[in-house]
Amino acid sequence: MDGYAVRAEAMEKRYGEKRALDGFDLAVGEGTVHGLLGPNGAGKTTAVRILSTLVRLDGGRATVAGLDVARQPREVRARIGLTGQYAAVDEVLTGRQNLEMFGRLFHLGGRRARLRATELLEQFDLTDAGDRGVGKYSGGMRRRLDLAASMILAPAVLFLDEPTTGLDPRSRGEVWESVRALVAGGTTVLLTTQYLEEADKLASRITVIDQGRAIADDTPDGLKNLVGGDRIEVVVAERAEIPRVVKVVARVADGEPEADETESRVHAPVTDRVTALTEVARTLQDEGVRVEDIGLRRPSLDDVFLRLTGHRTENTEAKEAA
């Protein structure tokens, strides 16, 4: 498989006059988590649906586990797992019964389905809850059960389409641990997500998609370097102090300081991070400027997203509108 579990070359998909994918390229290394990020309507879910054989492509070529998705869809389906935004489990059944049902649907037979259900309950830390109704599970437990169901046939490639949407931070963390364990066991994961933190923590490489095209592909740190290195940030108590802060920060900055008056914030790129922070903090104190917060930060993936697409992620915009 030339070291890649998923390959897409000039992939196209049209819905009437709309091009959902317009020459989309992707290369996902074996045994890795690869993040797919993009604004709403960028083509993320369309790409996953094509790669998982749910939708036919209109142009280009794609392979999964070395198999052509257009010419060998049945063989591809035997090598993949797919989990969407919502847990596809029956709340009336127990966790064990759900997994046994999926096993029988995949023609494992009764005995093998029962054995596989027991293995997966243990693998996803659900043994104690295995005989409880899924309706009594927490959100994180349901998502882990959904992941377990997608692993019934031990697929080589797992597609996770926004798997933690709507979960609280603790439940998201539980799902992340399950994903890490799968990858440690050799599974390749293609992850679409609206949580920048999720991609940063899980993905070893990220592709940014916008208007149906891949506009960037790199490691999380490599993408962050697109918008510069470390930055010093100062938040002051009074907006009137911003001009003075800009002058102080400019003395240590590697570029022009930027001021955000709505948040009383000044920030600028720096190279000698510790010296810059120390000097700015001391000078502002000596000049009697009331500082509410001061620190250093690395660019976030949200900064990258904003730089590349011109706007923030849906998740960030929703928070700001709240």
From Swiss-Prot:
InterPro entries: AAA+_ATPase, ABC_transporter-like_ATP-bd, ABC_transporter-like_CS, ABC_transporter_ATP-binding, DrrA, DrrA1-3-like_C, P-loop_NTPase. Disruption phenotype: Deletion of the drrA2-drrB2 operon decreases by 33% the daunorubicin (DNR) titer in cell culture. The drrA2-drrB2 mutant is more sensitive to DNR. Deletion of the drrA1-drrB1, drrA2-drrB2 and drrA3-drrB3 operons almost blocks DNR production in cell culture, suggesting that disruption of these operons impairs the efflux of DNR, resulting in intracellular accumulation. GO terms for biological process: daunorubicin transport; doxorubicin transport; response to antibiotic. One of its GO terms (molecular function) is ATP hydrolysis activity. It is found in: Cell membrane. Induction: Expression is repressed by the HTH-type transcriptional repressor DrrR1 in the absence of daunorubicin. GO terms for cellular component: plasma membrane. Part of the ABC transporter complex DrrA2B2 involved in daunorubicin efflux. Responsible for energy coupling to the transport system. Confers self-resistance to daunorubicin, an antibiotic produced by S.coeruleorubidus. The complex is probably composed of two ATP-binding proteins (DrrA2) and two transmembrane proteins (DrrB2). This is Daunorubicin resistance ATP-binding protein DrrA2. It comes from Streptomyces coeruleorubidus.
